[in-house]
């Protein structure tokens, strides 16, 4: 797992201090929601604390939680970065069902509770790189997608894993009004190759910062693929289908010359309208505290994933 060196003290440094205090007191993970040792109490039941295995100890640069939950792309709730937090606050995620179907021997459905207790949860601290050339570092909570794939027992025909976001225009104003939702033909669809899905880095996340995902971050369950641009990490998933054929994904349909199927982070392949060689780091400061850094190949996960693309021309297959 990649490590991060803190170049500055951010508010989220309190997060690690807090965890050590909790453990020293002999309290469980539920204590992470307590308001008296560094964080304000959450009012929403959706944001209750989770039980999970901590990430390995380290000195990480974490993006402030308020930036992670307040600066989002989730066009189902509007195209402005602040719109998801504003318009998703009453989004209902329970009851919920996640259907597993297609080329599998064992199709099944998980309900809301089963999303959190079917597989052991663990924390993964990952870089997150948006195709818009900004980045964060986020402590996700979830489980390896490979665990779900193994439970489904894909057949030999299963070459791709397709993900579908909820389609509910009554709850998602961007689906009701195409202008408000960025002109997308909903529901949102993404996909991985079966090999990408089985990579140990690929995560199905149900939380961040020790709590359930907020609605604007893709509650109750979303994909996290840290070596790909953020639009591949589909949110609020209701169906996962195993297929023999590669689908055309949402952004691939909308603008195929700008957004390819693979969407691997690559500083050597620019977006048609901007460079991908560097990125703006979302930190604790405001607009005047902008920090840029060089973008790493595969977002810094080259050692773990480069073998998946051996022999593939990444400038053509972007």
From Swiss-Prot:
Its cofactor is Mo-molybdopterin. Mo-molybdopterin binds at residues 72, 75-76, 130, 165, 217, 222, 233-235. Binds 1 Mo-molybdopterin (Mo-MPT) cofactor per subunit. The keyword Transport does not apply. GO terms for molecular function: metal ion binding; molybdopterin cofactor binding; oxidoreductase activity, acting on a sulfur group of donors, quinone or similar compound as acceptor. Keywords: Metal-binding, Molybdenum, Oxidoreductase, Periplasm, Signal. Pfam families: Oxidored_molyb. Residues 1-40 form the signal peptide. Predicted to be exported by the Tat system. The position of the signal peptide cleavage has not been experimentally proven. SUPFAM superfamilies: Oxidoreductase molybdopterin-binding domain (SSF56524). Disulfide bonds: none annotated. It is an enzyme of class 1 (oxidoreductase). Its EC number is 1.8.5.-. It catalyses: L-methionyl-[protein] + a quinone + H2O = L-methionyl-(S)-S-oxide-[protein] + a quinol; L-methionyl-[protein] + a quinone + H2O = L-methionyl-(R)-S-oxide-[protein] + a quinol. It is found in: Periplasm. One of its GO terms (cellular component) is periplasmic space. The keyword Metal-binding applies. Its main location: periplasm. One of its GO terms (biological process) is protein repair. InterPro entries: MsrP, OxRdtase_Mopterin-bd_dom, OxRdtase_Mopterin-bd_sf. Heterodimer of a catalytic subunit (MsrP) and a heme-binding subunit (MsrQ). Belongs to the MsrP family. PANTHER family: PROTEIN-METHIONINE-SULFOXIDE REDUCTASE, PROTEIN-METHIONINE-SULFOXIDE REDUCTASE CATALYTIC SUBUNIT MSRP. Part of the MsrPQ system that repairs oxidized periplasmic proteins containing methionine sulfoxide residues (Met-O), using respiratory chain electrons. Thus protects these proteins from oxidative-stress damage caused by reactive species of oxygen and chlorine generated by the host defense mechanisms. MsrPQ is essential for the maintenance of envelope integrity under bleach stress, rescuing a wide series of structurally unrelated periplasmic proteins from methionine oxidation. This is Protein-methionine-sulfoxide reductase catalytic subunit MsrP. It comes from Actinobacillus pleuropneumoniae serotype 5b (strain L20).
